[in-house]
Amino acid sequence: VTETALHCFLLEKLSSFHRQYPGVRLKLTSGTTPNTLADLKAGKTDLAVVTTPIREDSHFRVTLVKECQDILAGGSNYSYLKGKKVPLSEVQQYPFVSLAENTMTYALYKEFYASHGLILKPDIELATADLMVPVIRQGLGVGFIPRELVKKELEEGSIVEIEIEEKIEGRHICMVEDRQKPLSVAARHLIRLLKGKEPA
């Protein structure tokens, strides 16, 4: 599971699953989307829950389970930008916080910047989205992060949403199965729950 998928979708579902099947033990591993999918393909996991974008692979059956929206976020020291529509070219003037270069999120935003004739140049690269939250909250830079990950900080005002002129495409949390691999009964029940076909 990727960290964003865990926090924005899976934890709540796992809680329901655990209530329904208290005797079933689950082993969760976390990583980037490419690493998580590589583990699935290698047969190390039964199932992957990741965020888009993902590379197409005929081995995989992909089910979109939830939409999530990234926002440009900054600490309260960027509150003067709140309510304005800032062009992406202006965003480049501020220190930028990003996930590491080996992530699909980095690739997504590198492409997003390039499509607007700009080059993505992060000042701080982090391994996980979870680490981005305190770095942004402390005012060390601005960065694109799923709204759901910073919901509490947005409500309390320690992080502000900075609107940009360019449209940020919505992303999805996906459940990915290996078409070749038979699933255990527990995995089949979990998949049904994730797809919303089993009562929570």
Report the location of each language-model feature:
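Short beta-strand->loop
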Residues: 1-3, 61-71, 95-101, 156-169
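Central regulatory/effector-binding core of bacterial HTH transcription factors
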Residues: 1-56, 126
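A late-sequence structural motif
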Residues: 9, 162-200
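Ligand-binding cleft/hinge of the Venus flytrap
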Residues: 14-21, 44, 89, 106-119
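Hydrophobic hinge/microswitch elements
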Residues: 32-37, 41-44, 51, 110-162
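Flexible hinge/capping segments at coil-to-helix
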Residues: 59-96, 100
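Secondary-structure junction motif
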Residues: 80-82, 95-116, 183-187, 191
